[in-house]
UniProtKB/Swiss-Prot annotation:
PROSITE patterns: AA_TRNA_LIGASE_I. This is Isoleucine--tRNA ligase. The gene is ileS. HAMAP family: Ile_tRNA_synth_type2 (MF_02003). InterPro entries: aa-tRNA-synth_I_CS, aa-tRNA-synth_Ia, Anticodon_Ile_ABEc, Ile-tRNA-ligase, Ile-tRNA-ligase_type2, M/V/L/I-tRNA-synth_anticd-bd, Rossmann-like_a/b/a_fold, tRNAsynth_Ia_anticodon-bd.
Length: 1039
């Protein structure tokens, strides 16, 4: 009736068989087509780049993104799960540069832009097969046959439409600003790109001496972390509200001007203040040019100005200003009409006028500049300083802040709307809203979207010599306004650059501006561009916007999460998603960041091939909250497999084994209702589980849901099945046995449905054998079914509480046994419980589980246990020295057992002593709980248990019997006997144990299906250790 439950190739083998089944029956497509008349639940899949290999972080994002859509389909929603590929931008271009052995824009143009772009296009799916394999292997169900691709013309056209919307709203403009610039890639970057590339670096810093004009021996001291900017200095900036001084060092006659508060740190001991004054007095003072390679001809230069941003946190209180190389500097320059001196070319090298370092990369000249200043007596001091410096997020080159003409989206005008839309988003964890993400929005700057590169969505703006500009928002508009536009126009460079427009003002030809756009604009446009909106699928987009759910790694707070919100706010003034789970980083088994240089990168395929997808998924769901860092290794996943999957599998295997023996078909007992207390308890727990997990997943509490499933499965195995084994072993198919079978069957099937979104493979395997295998009318896959209904009538909270208490007492009893080093197979005479309310049924369970003869309720455990609670004097004494005697007295007045257990379990007890409210906890109290001689104790909360550990001769004999039965069962298993096989037992040599066996022969025979016991007969004996005694034993199967 049932397929035999085996794991010849482990769980990985099961998963391969299940994957084959899904393919054979087209289950994934059928799942996608479910609930066509249902309400939409919208999920957006953030697009990865397929020109790079997937890593273990991508496994995390995919398993987290998979679970909610699966769950929502089961709840009756129609869910579109469209995969996407991010195909433009620097990541692709850099790979092609490596492939071709070229570097930088000049070599690209020498190679040929058309050929280069073709190479880029051909490369974007280099690793797509690897991505598809990983996606399939982990069970991430997303439509990869019909993905959105950012380089396809329809997608680009939708992006153009978005840019045209911004143009029409006067949000898109061209400006000349100092921007973060990558000299290696030859393009400026946006603020959200820059935020992803900061690194702590140790750079050379310098305090330079700027000679006051008209003074022989007086200098301004200004500190800089970028000595390479000093040749372009045109001003010094102070804060007019601060106090400044003229001061001398202990040795020397030079007078230095700097902030008073920073003088001790800068000048050292023994300095002398010559004069003290407010910073305002310095405004307008002039100084001599520090490095006079080029003298500016326009604007003010070499003058002291004011800036609010100057602080006293470090440096000298005087900041050197080079408007060409910093946002703050540029702003100060504009406010004060300062000269603009740019001495660095687009490759990041000094121009030829800077003769000592002409043609050299500026960041490599810091030491040479410092040495030069020292030779010229213009250096006060130089030292290494660790600070955070931006690097290119793709090529890792240190960025320069460089003056460039670029196209911008005026995000600063939308700041209030961005913040308002952010308030409508539920973030998990919620501190992202007003923390990492909210702070970024508060400080938002205009988005520089143009890139001086080649492979990307072309900026659809055409310019005329007369100054007229037009933004094109569709292919149709391009064909209408363009000159000889090909019917099948390719929208990329260099083809689009050949398309000219007629200028409506002067009738000359307009040319497209050369830039492409930030590839993050592509991915941020996916809510509408994936549907080619507004040119197609208008109703589909509107029904699926905004998304109910997205999830990506924490880095995307500065990336995709931001660009989604920025574009959506600019165009629709709406939040583009409602719920977002932000994922933490994946670390190695030691908690360290994975990196190739450390050699600690875990290959996701290695883990999937050895441990399987379900184990990997379950590890990510349960190891920690999704937003916290997760340690990941093969060992971690193997432990997850053992703890949960193997437990579930063993319960399933147990059911099939005995149901097959009895030829039990649950379909014959659909309406059977069991009145067994254990059956009622597990059905109550099951329905509570269905209800709780439903609530958790509906509120995106994935880890809580998974842990509750894991706890239930543990109780199912280690309590329900363990307590009910004898019911399955009985010879007759009684109502009690039918109740045991039907209950376990219903629990397994429902548990698999609840766990299906988490572990889709093992649940399918169990469902196929328990449901499809028996019922020809069953749905052909568990993933085509609905979420199980909750039977509220089956939930009995009082029953759950009583059984949970009994289970808790049993676990405490086991703990007490372990503490006393007494096996559970050794019977004991008595257990004493602090609790006084426990029905007889549960007392019998406890006695049976713990192998105890008697349970005494409501016992005063203080008679058997030494509770000692003392103040931890180094802690409490330091805070309440004189009150210690009174604190001791107050502690002694409490119930010592309850207080001791409360503190040991992390609780807090509040006492009041002489009007002082004092919190007592594990840090300021010393607690010991030790059973007296002949007793063992364990406790948790208000529940305590004491075992009488005195072992009489009679108890010892019973212990020997239980140990012998255990050895026989192991021998049966090792011999490969079936559960129902009858055996002959051979025992020899130990007279004491042989006498015990004879005394308890009937018990041993019944427990082990032994028909005959042969004493000292001929057999192929092996030695067994029975409580320190050696017994020779052998078993043989009866004919």
């Amino acid at each position: 009736m049932y397929k035999k439950v085996e794991l010849p190739k482990g769980f990985v083998g099961v998963e391969k068989e299940v994957a084959d089944l899904w393919k054979e029956k087209n289950i994934i497509k059928k799942n996608f087509d479910m609930n066509q008349d249902g309400e939409y639940f919208t999920f957006y899949d953030g697009p990865p780049t397929a020109n790079g290999k997937p890593h273990v972080g991508h496994v995390l994002t995919r398993v987290m993104k998979d679970i909610i859509p699966r769950y929502k389909v089961m709840k009756g929603y129609k869910v579109i799960r469209k995969a996407g590929w991010d195909t433009h931008g620097l990541p692709v271009e850099l790979e092609i540069e490596k492939k071709l052995g070229i570097s930088g824009k000049p070599q690209i143009e020498d190679y040929g832009v058309e050929k280069f772009v073709t190479e880029c296009k051909d490369s974007v799916f280099t690793y797509v097969s690897m991505w598809e394999k990983m996606t399939e292997q982990i069970g991430y169900w997303v439509d990869m046959e019909n993905p959105y691709v950012t380089y396809h013309n329809p997608y680009i056209e939708s992006v153009w439409w978005a840019l045209k919307q911004m143009w029409d709203k006067k949000l898109l403009y061209k400006g000349y600003k100092t921007m973060p610039y990558c000299p290696r890639c030859g393009t400026s970057l946006s603020s959200h790109e820059v935020s992803q590339g900061y690194k702590d670096v140790k750079d050379l810093t310098a305090v330079a001496k700027f000679k006051v004009k008209g003074e022989d021996n007086k200098y301004f001291l200004a500190w800089t972390t970028t000595p390479w900017t000093l040749p372009s200095n045109v001003a010094l900036c102070i804060n007019k509200a601060y106090d400044y001084v003229e001061a001398k060092q202990a040795e020397g006659d030079e007078i230095f001007i700097l902030a008073k508060e920073l003088a001790p740190k800068v000048l050292g001991e023994g300095f002398e203040i010559v004069r003290e004054f407010k910073g305002e007095e310095l405004l307008g003072m002039e100084y001599e040019q520090l490095l006079p390679f080029v003298t500016p001809t326009e604007g003010k230069a070499f003058v002291v100005v004011h800036g609010d941003y100057v602080t006293l946190s470090d440096g000298t209180g005087i900041v050197h200003i080079a408007p060409a190389y910093g946002e703050d500097d540029n702003l100060i320059g504009k406010q004060n009409g300062l000269a603009f001196l740019n001495l660095v070319d687009l490759s990041g090298n000094f121009v030829e006028e800077v003769t000592p370092w002409a043609g050299k990369f500026v960041k490599k000249c810091d030491q040479q500049i410092v040495d030069y200043l020292k030779e010229q007596n213009k250096l006060f001091k130089a030292e290494k300083h660790t600070h955070s410096y931006p690097h290119c997020w793709r090529c890792d080159t240190p960025l320069l802040y460089y003056p460039k003409e670029s196209w911008f989206v005026a995000m600063t005008t939308l700041r209030d709307k961005l913040l308002a839309n952010n308030e409508k988003i539920n973030w998990y964890p919620d501190n992202i809203k007003n923390g990492r993400f909210g702070k970024f929005l508060e400080n938002v700057i205009d988005w520089g979207i143009s890139r001086d590169r080649y492979w990307g969505t072309p900026l659809p703006i055409w310019e005329c010599e007369c100054g007229h500009r037009e933004c094109i928002g569709s292919i149709e508009e391009l064909k209408t306004k363009g000159i000889n536009v090909p019917e099948d126009i390719e929208l990329h460079k260099p083809y689009i650059d050949k398309v000219h427009l007629n200028c409506p003002h002067c009738n000359k030809e307009m040319k497209r501006t050369a830039e492409v756009i930030d590839c993050w604009f592509d991915s941020g446009s996916m809510p509408f561009a994936q549907h080619h909106y507004p040119f197609e699928n208008k109703e589909l987009f509107e029904a699926n916007y905004p998304a109910q759910f997205i999830s990506e790694a924490v880095d995307q707070t500065r990336g995709w999460f931001y660009t989604l919100l920025a574009i959506s706010t600019a165009i629709f003034d709406r939040n583009p998603f409602e719920n977002c789970i932000v994922l933490g980083h994946v670390l190695d088994k030691k908690g360290l960041k994975m990196s190739k240089s450390k050699g600690n990168v875990v290959d996701p395929f290695e883990v999937l091939d050895s441990q399987g997808a379900d184990a990997t998924r379950w590890h990510f769901y349960t190891a920690s909250a999704p937003w916290l860092p997760t340690r990941f290794s093969i060992e971690d996943v193997a432990e997850t497999q053992r703890k949960f999957l193997s437990t579930l599998w063993n319960v399933y295997s147990f059911y099939v084994l005995y149901a097959e023996l009895d030829n039990f078909n649950p379909l014959d007992y659909k309406d059977f209702v069991s009145d067994n207390v254990m059956d009622k308890w597990i059905m109550s727990k099951l329905n509570t589980l269905v209800k709780d997990v439903d609530d958790h997943l509906n509120n995106y509490r994935i880890t809580q849901a998974a842990l509750e499933i894991e706890e239930f499965t543990d109780e199912l195995s280690n309590w329900y099945v363990r307590r009910n084994r004898a019911r399955y072993w009985s010879e007759e198919l009684t109502d009690d046995k039918i109740g045991a079978y039907t209950t376990l069957y219903r629990v397994l099937v429902t548990l698999c449905k609840v766990a299906a979104p988490f572990v889709p493979f093992i649940t399918e395997e169990i469902y196929q054998n328990l449901v499809v295998n028996l019922d020809e009318n069953a749905l052909e896959s568990i993933h085509l079914g609905a979420w199980p209904e909750v039977d509220e009538k089956a939930i009995d909270k009082k029953l759950e509480e009583k059984m949970d208490l009994a289970y808790k007492i049993v676990k405490l009893g086991r703990s007490a046994r372990n503490g006393a080093n007494i096996k559970n197979r050794q019977p004991l005479s008595k257990m004493l419980l602090s609790t006084s309310e426990l029905p007889e049924y549960y007392g019998d369970i406890i006695k049976d589980e713990l192998n105890i003869k008697e349970v005494e309720l409501g016992a005063d455990l203080s008679k058997y246990v030494n509770f000692e609670i003392k103040p931890n004097l180094p802690v409490l004494g330091r805070a309440y020295g004189k009150l210690i005697p009174a604190i001791r007295k107050e502690i002694a007045s409490r119930n010592q057992m309850e207080l001791a257990q409360k503190i040991q379990n992390g609780g807090v007890e509040v006492i009041t002593v002489d009007g002082n409210e004092i919190e007592l906890n594990a840090e300021n109290l010393l607690v010991t709980m030790q059973g007296l001689e002949g007793f063992a104790f364990a406790g948790e909360g208000s529940v305590g248990v004491v075992l009488d550990t005195t072992i009489t001769d009679e108890l010892r004999e019973e212990g020997h019997v239980r140990e012998i039965i255990s050895k026989i069962q192991n021998m049966r298993k090792e011999s490969g006997f079936e559960v129902a096989d009858k055996i002959t037992l051979y025992v020899a040599e130990n007279d004491m144990l042989l006498d015990v066996i004879k005394k308890f022969e009937d018990v041993i025979k019944k427990e082990t299906l032994t028909e005959e016991i042969v004493y000292n007969g001929n057999a192929d004996y092996s030695e067994a250790k029975v409580n320190g005694e050696i017994l020779k034993m052998a078993v043989s199967k009866r004919a």
